Amino acid sequence: MSNVTHQPKIGFVSLGCPKNLVDSERILTELRTEGYDVVPTYDNADMVIVNTCGFIDSAVQESLEAIGEALKENGKVIVTGCLGAKEDQIREVHPKVLEITGPHSYEQVLEHVHHYTPKPKHNPFLSLVPEQGVKLTPRHYAYLKISEGCNHRCTFCIIPSMRGDLVSRPIGEVLAEAKRLADAGVKELLVISQDTSAYGVDVKHRTGFHNGMPVKTSMVSLCEELAKLGIWVRLHYVYPYPHVDDVIPLMAEGKILPYLDIPLQHASPRILKLMKRPGSADRQLARIKQWREICPDLTLRSTFIVGFPGETEEDFQMLLDFLKEARLDRVGCFKYSPVEGATANELADQVPEEVKEERWNRFMQLQQQISAERLQEKVGREILVLVDEVDEEGAIGRSMADAPEIDGAVYLNGETRVKPGDVVRVKVEHADEYDLWGTRV
């Protein structure tokens, strides 16, 4: 008779944005800490956890399909994440799901796992988890989530109904995690949240402590402290508050990456008002001009929506004029699509699909030309590149201007003497509208 005890196995699916990925990492870290095995297939797992996305209709569909596949292959499924906030919608399609929780419900997920799968017998002195926790990104970069939820009520968005109002993590806790990641060899931290520039607003920017020293809970103080780690620090999801101006000098001094991901969404004052978004195009253009004077190497990424309800040709032309003037480096564009629960669905003058498509094409054609011209300016220059992949044909990396997965890449054809995580100096020899090619200096 064998005395080998069965080690419970958990299958895991993570869908959606980097913020959801961080939630998955936290759940997986807890599971591994308790001694559960995490396995890549469903058929030999004791149960499956599906961390869902519910931001847009296509994401909802993908999540429902993933749940269905897990039920078919395994039968015992726990659902969490943004779509979990809509339990009725999930139960209607998949009534056999065991349990459903909303986003960032880590303790509830673990309680459900304990209920349906026996807790492993685990020697607490045997560490199954690295100090930095389980990471789903390559070893040389990691996402650092600084807050949860959002206080804004943009009419096209349902995130606050899923993830709640802003809750900032204690700054000492955030900085301790950042230090653990840096000590583990992470070369780039990607700071994420629903609204990075609002960090600390909910706690009135109270003073926290890190290494026994007082630190204000604010985006600027956070950046100043992260700069001391000596690794790349990249800011994402930065709402255009006035105090964003205060981080530009830190970028100019090389303390954090000269990169700002700032979702502007539109340029027409009328459409911005319908979206419940702040600011005017003229004021934003003036700020961009000022930022570039302070930090000439600044890379600006933004996202926009075309075909928002009520958008006229005149409104759209304002957006194109803004693009021509702003000359942003990296731009994402989405055709407006109704999201269940979003107040924008009730607005008058919905734009026909063929008009959305036509405007999206015009937008992308213009921005691709601008992006190509911006990258062409880098030909002949030397830049730093963080290596992501290496094979027999060469290496692929990213410059300071490139976030993983959403931006471009730098191709080093024939360069095989490097490894992922290396930072190398490269001379740029060629560019298109998205990527660069170069050789190591």
UniProtKB/Swiss-Prot annotation:
InterPro entries: Elp3/MiaA/NifB-like_rSAM, Methylthiotransferase, Methylthiotransferase_CS, Methylthiotransferase_N, Methylthiotransferase_N_sf, NA-bd_OB-fold, Ribosomal_uS12_MeSTrfase_RimO, rSAM. One of its GO terms (biological process) is tRNA modification. One of its GO terms (cellular component) is cytosol. It catalyses: L-aspartate(89)-[ribosomal protein uS12]-hydrogen + (sulfur carrier)-SH + AH2 + 2 S-adenosyl-L-methionine = 3-methylsulfanyl-L-aspartate(89)-[ribosomal protein uS12]-hydrogen + (sulfur carrier)-H + 5'-deoxyadenosine + L-methionine + A + S-adenosyl-L-homocysteine + 2 H(+). Transmembrane segments: none annotated. PROSITE patterns: MTTASE_N, MTTASE_RADICAL, RADICAL_SAM, TRAM. It holds the Pfam family UPF0004. Its EC number is 2.8.4.4. It is found in: Cytoplasm. Catalyzes the methylthiolation of an aspartic acid residue of ribosomal protein uS12. NCBIfam families: 30S ribosomal protein S12 methylthiotransferase RimO, MiaB/RimO family radical SAM methylthiotransferase. Belongs to the methylthiotransferase family. RimO subfamily. This is Ribosomal protein uS12 methylthiotransferase RimO. It comes from Klebsiella pneumoniae subsp. pneumoniae (strain ATCC 700721 / MGH 78578). The gene is rimO.
